[in-house]
């Protein structure tokens, strides 16, 4: 039933979140790592804590034991353990709380889960104040560069960042197709009773075709052939399972009338590419949504930078009613960074014009950067020009608190 973790020794790309995970383990009785399926949660935790025993609660026999005899199950783990997919047995959390409270020490249990909201609710009821929570997304650009995978922009927009694709050299079209089918068959069923699978599949593909756009649930639902309340429910399912992400609009103290609707992105740009029908790297360059996919990759790279350091999202976008827009505002304790994405490999000097106007409207803006599809860092008078691959390192310089 149970695997001794000492036998687990995968070849692993070191994840940027590892130091934070290890530090928090010494400060809390529990650390909970959540994130998409196949983002590397199990590999991360088992490699970080090789001396902890491991149990996968998705295995039917393990789950049955934990559900029917929780005290007997936990008796095997008096000194702590890694429990994978803890949301499958939410009632176990109350028993874990008692066991950890009786032990009275930090560094006991590491929990993983891939259902964002259900897991948060369960933890809030049983482990409030006792667990640190980390979110692990697929590889960042820097992590991808540690593999032998291509980091050319079009290759990345096609293949995405799921570790399994790059660790095991799986054809992205096959891997992402399998991921999507497994998601529909397993996760969607556990999260919601969706009767019309055909409409739901259409809905997901429509969402992928709208990355980087303002979210309009009425239009999205109409195109999918469902009501607005149904579209809202289905989008919440995509968010709960780490498929889709809503970037909030900036609502600071400015005199302009601002757009309030969020923008829609996918946690993995490769999955979005797959769902809009891209089947090879060569199709990316001429695809009409290439710019939106590049913007998606930029936003996720900034989000991964935060989450990999144990920080919450500090991201928003700016758009006023007259169309003045900035793709991404990144707030820090020392001011805000305004970022614009330009997927072309050649930098156009007028790219800073809109950023300058946004900086004039948003007094907190201290730095401006254009993230583009080229490969050269350029320090300009008005700001910095960055390749996508350099964004994380540059944010590290700008955000001293991260």
PLM region descriptions:
Residues 93-111:
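Conserved catalytic/switch belt of AAA+ P-loop NTPases
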Residues 148, 373-402:
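Domain-level recognition of nuclease-like catalytic cores that cleave nucleotide substrates
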Residues 44:
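Hydrophobic positions on the alpha1 helix immediately C-terminal to the Walker A/P-loop
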Residues 33:
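Hydrophobic anchor at the beta1->P-loop junction of P-loop NTPases
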């Amino acid at each position: 039933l149970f695997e001794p973790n000492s036998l687990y020794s995968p070849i692993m790309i070191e994840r940027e979140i590892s130091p934070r995970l290890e530090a928090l383990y010494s400060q809390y009785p529990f650390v909970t790592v959540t994130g998409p399926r196949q983002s590397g949660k199990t590999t991360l935790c088992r490699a970080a804590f090789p001396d902890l025993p491991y149990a996968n609660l998705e295995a039917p026999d393990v789950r049955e034991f934990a559900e029917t005899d929780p005290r007997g199950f936990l008796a095997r783990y008096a000194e702590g353990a890694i429990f994978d997919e803890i949301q499958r047995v939410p009632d176990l959390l109350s028993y874990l709380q008692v066991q950890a409270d009786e032990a009275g020490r930090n560094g006991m249990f590491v929990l993983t889960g891939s259902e964002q909201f259900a897991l948060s609710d369960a933890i809030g009821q049983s482990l409030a104040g006792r667990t640190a929570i980390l979110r692990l997304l697929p590889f960042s650009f820097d992590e991808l560069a540690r593999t032998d995978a291509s980091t050319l922009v079009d290759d990345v927009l096609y293949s995405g960042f799921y570790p399994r694709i790059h660790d095991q050299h799986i054809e992205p079209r096959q891997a992402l197709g399998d991921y999507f089918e497994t998601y529909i068959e397993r996760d969607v069923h556990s999260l919601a009773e969706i009767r019309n699978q055909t409409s739901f599949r259409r809905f997901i593909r429509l969402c992928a075709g709208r990355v980087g756009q303002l979210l309009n649930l009425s239009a999205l639902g109409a195109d999918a052939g469902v009501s607005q309340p149904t579209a809202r429910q289905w989008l919440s399912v995509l968010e709960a399972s780490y498929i889709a992400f809503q970037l909030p609009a900036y609502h600071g103290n400015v005199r302009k009338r601002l757009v309030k609707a969020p923008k829609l992105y996918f946690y993995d740009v490769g999955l979005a590419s797959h769902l809009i029908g891209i089947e090879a790297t060569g199709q990316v360059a001429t695809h009409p949504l290439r710019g939106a996919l590049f913007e998606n990759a930029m936003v996720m790279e900034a989000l991964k930078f935060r989450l990999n350091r144990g920080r919450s999202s500090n991201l928003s976008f700016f758009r006023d009613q007259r169309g003045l827009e900035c793709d991404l505002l990144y707030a820090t304790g020392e001011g805000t960074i305004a970022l614009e994405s330009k997927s072309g490999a050649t930098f156009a000097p007028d790219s800073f014009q809109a950023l300058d106007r946004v900086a004039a409207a948003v007094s907190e803006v201290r730095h401006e950067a254009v993230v583009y599809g080229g490969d050269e860092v350029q320090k300009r008078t008005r700001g910095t020009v960055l390749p996508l691959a350099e964004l994380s390192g540059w944010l590290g310089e700008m955000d001293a608190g991260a």
